[in-house]
Amino acid sequence: MKAPIFKSISTNKIDFDLKNFSGKYIVLYFYPKDDTPGCTIETNDFNKLLPQFKKINCEIFGISKDSLNSHKKFKKKYGIKFDLLSDENKEIIKKYKVWGKKQFMGREFMGLIRSTFLIDKKGKIIKIWKNVKVKDHAKEVLETLKDLIK
């Protein structure tokens, strides 16, 4: 399946266009909220493994509906070395179908479903993780990519 194309503004103040990354592998991970426990663990884990992802020609981007300002604070606080993309209007979130019903403490509500998409050099989605459990997730994504490119 072809990855939905989108444009956004990144935390590095560049106009992000997915098309500009053809020829590279891409990890797009969608997370609910900056600076919350699970999202911080997941982001820090991807950050720690970033050099290994870069070695195999892979870029990482985190996406949530937080504002660009929130993302900048989050990046600075934890020394995150990759771009975060803001999707306050949920346009990207809806294109990737990661907005849906969630449950927490017996309450049902609509929210962002923690998900990761692995995209190949030609812009094709080659692996999807939905309802991600953050522990060891970044490592699993890296190992999956390494296995796929052997």
Region locations from a protein language model:
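Chalcogenol-based redox active-site neighborhoods
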Residues: 1-150
